UniProtKB/Swiss-Prot annotation:
One of its GO terms (molecular function) is DNA-binding transcription factor activity. This is Homeobox protein vab-15. Residues 1-44 are annotated as: Disordered. It is found in: Nucleus. Disruption phenotype: Worms exhibit the absence of AVM, PVM, and PLM touch cells, defective egg laying, embryonic or larval lethality, cell degeneration, malformation of the posterior body, and uncoordinated movement. The keyword Transcription applies. Residues 129-188 bind DNA. Coiled coil: none annotated. PROSITE patterns: HOMEOBOX_1, HOMEOBOX_2. Residues 23-32 have a biased composition (Basic and acidic residues). Belongs to the Msh homeobox family. It holds the Pfam family Homeodomain. Probable transcription factor needed for the proper production of touch cell precursors. Involved in specification of lateral neuroblasts. Essential for embryonic morphogenesis. It comes from Caenorhabditis elegans. The gene is vab-15.
Amino acid sequence: MVSKDEKPKQSGLFSVESLLETPKQKCREDLPKPTPITPKTPMLIPGLHPMTPYFGAQLDPVMIYFAQTGNRLPIVSSDSSPESCASSPLSMQHSLQWLSSQREDSPTSDDAKIQIGLSKCMLRKHKNNRKPRTPFSTQQLISLERKFQSKQYLSIAERAEFSASLQLTETQVKIWFQNRRAKSKRLQEAEVEKVKFAQASAYAAAAVGGAPDPSSILAFYQPQW
């Protein structure tokens, strides 16, 4: 026999509160607890460089999933600013892309513009300041060439007298003689190269056979300078 005092206790087991609370507790106990994923080694995320601030940091499980599966990360809309993108780990790739595009699309800095302007001004100034060539007359050129053939270097007194006879300044005569000596040197070097080339060709032909003596060929070649 069950005493009257024990009936309320038994009836309490089947009350509405006990029936509602028991499934909740069982469901909570049966649910598997998620194990925290903490990679021991730094995880490489596609699109991120190892030297970025996010490398080696605590990563979100969703980020690890996309990194392991090779799927592309969701990209945030381009309307978002870099401050809002940086707050979410999933938008790191978009942030880097946004920064790189901003860096590429950014106009030339003021310093670079100033340097370009200065270089252009210097080139333009140098070009405008170049003195025009002295328009020598035909008679003056003939006299200068004759004087150069007789003497390539003039003394100060000779240059003063010669420039006065041609109605030219001493500087003009001096510069003309300098340029003429440089031209004569170039012509001599070109003639030497021609002689070397002819000699090499003659020896090559003699080595093949059937060609005359190279010395007989070079005897007809008279360098002119």
